[in-house]
Amino acid sequence: MANRSIRDGDNPELLEERRMATFDTDKMAAVIYGSEEFARRRREITDAVSKIPELADIKPYPFLTREEKVTEGTRKISILTKYLNQLIDRDNEEESLHLHREVIGYEGHPFALHDALFIPTLQSQASDEQQEKWLERARRREIIGCYAQTELGHGSNLRNLETTAVYDIASQEFVLHTPTTTALKWWPGALGKSCNYALVVAELIIKRNNYGPHFFMVQLRDEKTHIPLKGVTVGDIGPKMNFNAADNGYLGLNNLRVPRTNLLMRHCKVEADGTYVKPPHAKIGYSGMVKIRSQMAMEQGLFLAHALTIAARYSAVRRQGHLDDKQVEVKVLDYQTQQHRLFPSLARAYAFIFTGFETIHLYSQLLKDVDMGNTSGMADLHALTSGLKSVVAHETGEGIEQARMACGGHGYSMASYISVVYGIAIGGCTYEGENMVMLLQLARYLVKSVELIKAGKAKKLGPVASYLADKSDETDLTSLNGYVKMFENMARRQAWKATEKFLKLMESGESREVAWNKSAVELTRASRLHTRLFIIEAFMRRVSRIEDIPVKEVLTDLLHLHVNYELLDVATYALEFMSFTQLDYVRDQLYLYLEKIRPNAVSLVDSFQISDMQLRSVLGRRDGHVYENLFKWAKSSPLNNADVLPSVEKYLKPMMEKAKL
Amino acid sequence: MANRSIRDGDNPELLEERRMATFDTDKMAAVIYGSEEFARRRREITDAVSKIPELADIKPYPFLTREEKVTEGTRKISILTKYLNQLIDRDNEEESLHLHREVIGYEGHPFALHDALFIPTLQSQASDEQQEKWLERARRREIIGCYAQTELGHGSNLRNLETTAVYDIASQEFVLHTPTTTALKWWPGALGKSCNYALVVAELIIKRNNYGPHFFMVQLRDEKTHIPLKGVTVGDIGPKMNFNAADNGYLGLNNLRVPRTNLLMRHCKVEADGTYVKPPHAKIGYSGMVKIRSQMAMEQGLFLAHALTIAARYSAVRRQGHLDDKQVEVKVLDYQTQQHRLFPSLARAYAFIFTGFETIHLYSQLLKDVDMGNTSGMADLHALTSGLKSVVAHETGEGIEQARMACGGHGYSMASYISVVYGIAIGGCTYEGENMVMLLQLARYLVKSVELIKAGKAKKLGPVASYLADKSDETDLTSLNGYVKMFENMARRQAWKATEKFLKLMESGESREVAWNKSAVELTRASRLHTRLFIIEAFMRRVSRIEDIPVKEVLTDLLHLHVNYELLDVATYALEFMSFTQLDYVRDQLYLYLEKIRPNAVSLVDSFQISDMQLRSVLGRRDGHVYENLFKWAKSSPLNNADVLPSVEKYLKPMMEKAKL
């Protein structure tokens, strides 16, 4: 059997879909998740979790108040702590991520930053003695930590952080202080209520000299009572668009004193007498950010996959209207408009995941290079991941919302759960670097590259930018390589054009900053085209390496859909290099591949193997029994606990009675 | 003073902005709201409401649980009932809408459908005797009603509703029945918990003949106890993406009997012996839908205005990074990327509101014509509003999300409130006709129009479609009329092209339905272009009628921004009619007008005169005191009621203690 999701008793609508699969969904999962081994481990973890009743949701998440969500996240994390060694290899980040997604979902928990930033920062920034003191305790979860950097008044611009750590030579202490309301640390996950320690980023000041932002270990709460220490003002920043099981917090410090040895001193040092010893390499703190961004394409791809799983399955269950058959209504998945809403996003989900694998691989490669003293790849990867993060998070958000709307009215119900996935995914446009800022960081790299070429130094270009030095050729669209050439033409033209605009403005007398700002939108356009080119190439590279023929065939269809959709989407740029006849051809190809994908659509989403537990969606259930479960779900929702609501007794009944008089 | 929003003690950042206004914001408000009279009434209502303490929010809405939101909506509506006559002219729909938006906001209340559909349907569908029986009681709010049409298994396809009303001649009763789970009425606002009556849409069946959907008055709950009657299963459908103060409901009817006279019989009749008397005009029930859609452009424009008010004000308060001045950080509103995120949407907000006025006017004109027996304009307006509803709701959603992201991290906090506005507005892509279905309804009209032209009957075209018969001319972009011509060229070309594709597929042997489906995406493209053309023209018509020079000047700038942005957005189509040099000109114009709008940006959003109460946003406060109020808001959020959460006591403390052993 090719689709492995078939079970007895399934809705026949989905059975029919799954029987059309032309490939083995387990083999596709191995391609999606990078190895047969990890795809199998995912299934095993899902299976093991399903057998531990205390790890199940106490209620559907949408029925919980915010306080209940925080409690539920905390309950789950404390229970998971018991089972961790039994369920996963704790050193395997991917297994851990999958486990947490299954059990806790997307809405957050008190250990989010503890594992993702607190411990890694201790590992990379704390000296050996400091690690001895704190790292094991943190690993054993004796203490809970977070990472406190952004402030109420400042996000991405680290140079203007207001929190200070002034060194007091007499007592050999740092005095940490947030002098204004805008200096309050704001947003760090789990800072508000859960953590008792924080790594606080503050401007290091010695004898009135500012040495810039550094990390300080700060105890926030008493380890026994959990009550905030004197000088510490800490609390939750209030409800958010999503992540409401997490207690993102604020933190004010009122001349709080910590010992000199609480400055993380792996790379820099402050001696007892106040002598500052510089770190050997200025960019050493940089790579954590690049790491997280390099994982984002994969993560966002999975968010998109989540939403599409729900929408594609539901679209095969929902019938509405008629085509040829006047007796039986048609599955809404048979409408071209529905396919056009879902399938290009499906191609993107695959593309993003494959691109994510590549950047994660590039990142590990970079770490090895840096260890060997070679930091030349840093700028390339930083630029690449900045662009990817922006483009992928933006297109993921669009795709998720279209998936939700493709579910009609029921998509709007929390029973679809798609709006939660949207809320989480769209955060990616803002966190880890605001999208416009990120696109402009990539643009800086592109402009530098063009300037290198103009200076005759094209050989110094990073591998991702080398096409910028090529000549734009006429190309045909008879092969995938033709599409790549077309995207190269477009990305190259726009990078040069935006650079020229910027340079011309400077020549005309504008300052560098003003010229940059006046070219900014054109520069972001260049960054987007460059990034989309990279995604297409990564998709192609991955497909070319697949050995299983049926899997390769359907992914080749998806790739064709992708290149045609993408090209049409930016055809304004393409028309400098192709004719309207070619454009019509691209359109026809697009519609052709929508039809080609149709029979495999449900199997392509099944291949993501996102369990019902993780989907948390009535519409997206594997078994397709949507309607009876929507009714069940609704009946159990909290508002239905009473037939007559207290508010009806209190307000509506008296109002109606009074009107009768 | 030109900007009327200036008060003592405001944040100087906003004061500086407002002092740059080149026009009078009260005069602009009169243009936005159609008359000086209504703009003034809005301010008076806002002012009056602010003086009635019991109409204030008991807490910021984001701090309320769903149950508390329902209670709060109910409390407010019952208090408002007392004050209605004092605060507004009850016959004035606009005043009523404004009042409800101020006091209750966007998240719903138990009378949403009572006023908007229950009473109007009684007015248009109930006979005089029936009106006497129910209408006055409904108006006095002795009873609360809703309108129950969509079912769990069927939304827009009315022909396949499953609920039946079988006439029993012996007892002269209708037997109402929902035979399956999918037949449950699903979604009607206030049906779940608040209403005691419903107008139920059911298939009328007499002697096994199905006469199609009809309206039946059905009592759901006992008027005294509010307990559901026998045969009635009713409840809340659970939490939604938004509208969570509303109890959208489900309804099952188990062979419930109602008297023959509960069929609404203004236009059709069922005699005691089961004789069915047809309504005189088949489309008579149609116009309610057209009315609501004709108001949607205005409504969505105001949602967009709401989000932009928040984002523009906050962008003038938030400082981040540097341009020329290395000492003082720059307002983020000075970044071109930020302007590009906000100002084209600002132009659209104005455009949508102006377009809304036109369609509302066309609707009243239509009603007069229909009264005179002339229904010829019906199809035109139906097509127009179908397209408008789709394009405007889609672009509004995009614009609101961009506004939220323009606020960076704080945009993601519920303190911005933008995500609530998004949740409400984006519902407009689905309710009142799913967007794709709507675009295809307009497409049907466009195809018919092209077929008329091909048949030599161009004179029969509706006024909105007459341009389809013109020849495509070369045009220049030196005047606004040039842009209109360009949009006509594009919309015409695409309408013809999509029609040809459809006809060709039929010629090649496909059935009408299949040919239609295979052309569907191209047809929706035609509908979008046609609609965007109409919006541009409506914007131009409105600006041309303005007398106040300063107001006209700034709106002319906004109009120029609009046409350039819109043209660039669909340049793929435009390039068939213009050169790349012209395209570069359009880009330059776009950036030029972003700069031109900049000094008036805050004053342009101030002109919407959306009160702080209605904004419900800490970021968007009129006085600009954002940061201290964010802190205040956060401190008062429910999670901060205790320093140490119960979940910390119960789960985290034991976990940490155990780890120490």
Swiss-Prot record, chains A, B:
Its localization reads: Peroxisome
| GO cellular component terms attached to this protein's record | peroxisome
Database matches in InterPro entries = ACOX_C_alpha1, Acyl-CoA_ox_N, Acyl-CoA_Oxase/DH_mid-dom_sf, Acyl-CoA_oxidase, Acyl-CoA_oxidase_C, AcylCo_DH-like_C, AcylCoA_DH/ox_N_sf, AcylCoA_DH/oxidase_NM_dom_sf
Give the motif span (Microbody targeting signal): 659-661
Query: What EC number is given for this enzyme?
Result: 1.3.3.-
Give the function comment from the record.
Involved in the first step of peroxisomal beta-oxidation by catalyzing the desaturation of fatty acid-derived side chains of ascaroside pheromones, which regulates development and behavior. Specifically, shortens ascarosides with 5-carbon omega side chain (asc-omega-C5). Does not shorten indol-3-carbonyl(IC)-ascaroside with 7-carbon or 9-carbon side chains. Does not catalyze the desaturation of fatty acids or hydroxylated fatty acids.
Protein known as: Acyl-coenzyme A oxidase acox-1.2
